Amino acid sequence: MKSRAAVAFAPGKPLEIVEIDVAPPKKGEVLIKVTHTGVCHTDAFTLSGDDPEGVFPVVLGHEGAGVVVEVGEGVTSVKPGDHVIPLYTAECGECEFCRSGKTNLCVAVRETQGKGLMPDGTTRFSYNGQPLYHYMGCSTFSEYTVVAEVSLAKINPEANHEHVCLLGCGVTTGIGAVHNTAKVQPGDSVAVFGLGAIGLAVVQGARQAKAGRIIAIDTNPKKFELARRFGATDCINPNDYDKPIKDVLLDINKWGIDHTFECIGNVNVMRAALESAHRGWGQSVIIGVAGSGQEISTRPFQLVTGRVWKGSAFGGVKGRSQLPGMVEDAMKGDIDLEPFVTHTMSLDEINDAFDLMHEGKSIRTVIRY
């Protein structure tokens, strides 16, 4: 079938809006019509050429919502007409990782997904007879996309796709990191480095967890109003100080902050976040994705004296079994999604959405098909 899509033909180049061919779903696969998709920093990271798994030409996009059109052989968990959110972190329930109960990092389709391919090692997309790669198992920058059954969360059909599509990545990643990775407790102190969608979601999650002091940190003070709305008690611009941000936080509590979250992908900030964590028990959670080849460092004494350095992917959330409940929470108002959507655009305007993001003028732009 034909589908309009925003295709990245080469790194560092604007996306091109073209009509592509989408093949029917094969065994264990599902064809969906995407209704809405967010434009995320991870899409921009891959488009920049810095992503070690980046392959081109590719249909980007991984933060979407849509409706099932057709199912392949053996698919039982969804049917045509079901409303779904594609998942870049699958949940098969059968691999060693799923069975462990310790992680959400399912490996059922990981090997092929990282190569831009479907589980059978081929692609369902083509343009002028030439194959196009998939992206993170989702490719939501196409009006129609094919996704593995294990990479789909079935959601309430009454949910507002313009809002809940954000649960496909950014908001879930931030809120989940608070509850699942850090396990923030009532009264704990929290510092959030970077107030994009993920960082703001961490702030909201910290408020849900009844954290005592929630410190929001960004060099763009325009982000502070929304951070306060989501629950920040303090907003700090590092540019307002003539000393490292670590020292600013240690002035707040000389022993450090109970939980720090790095939501940028800057290895220097990752170190500052760790070294701002509380001596004896502080945790620092890395959420931001650093560029290819970059490494983190600190003095071992930081860890010897009780700090813990952790990472979080998709907030530790198991997509098929847990994400539908988060959609219900959003519908009840327990998760506030609307403020994240600062702009809505058509697919033809998608390059403008990337520009807004790079200029710091948007939190999330949602593309409506």
From Swiss-Prot:
CDD domains listed in its UniProt record: alcohol_DH_class_III
Subunit: Homodimer.
Note accompanying the cofactor annotation: Binds 2 Zn(2+) ions per subunit.
Key words, A-Z: Cytoplasm, Metal-binding, NAD, Oxidoreductase, Zinc
Annotated positions binding Zn(2+) 1: C40, H62, C169
A Gene Ontology BP annotation from the UniProt entry: formaldehyde catabolic process
Record-level Gene Ontology MF annotations: alcohol dehydrogenase (NAD+) activity; S-(hydroxymethyl)glutathione dehydrogenase (NAD+) activity; S-(hydroxymethyl)glutathione dehydrogenase (NADP+) activity; S-nitrosoglutathione reductase (NADH) activity; zinc ion binding
Name recorded for this polypeptide: S-(hydroxymethyl)glutathione dehydrogenase
CC terms in the record's Gene Ontology section: cytosol
Subcellular location: Cytoplasm
Class of enzymatic activity (EC top level): oxidoreductase
Main location class: cytoplasm
Gene: frmA
Residues at which Zn(2+) 2 binds: C92, C95, C98, C106
Recorded catalytic activity of this chain's protein: S-(hydroxymethyl)glutathione + NADP(+) = S-formylglutathione + NADPH + H(+); S-(hydroxymethyl)glutathione + NAD(+) = S-formylglutathione + NADH + H(+); a primary alcohol + NAD(+) = an aldehyde + NADH + H(+); a secondary alcohol + NAD(+) = a ketone + NADH + H(+)
InterPro entries xref list: ADH-like_C (IPR013149), ADH-like_N (IPR013154), ADH_3 (IPR014183), ADH_Zn_CS (IPR002328), GroES-like_sf (IPR011032), NAD(P)-bd_dom_sf (IPR036291), PKS_ER (IPR020843)
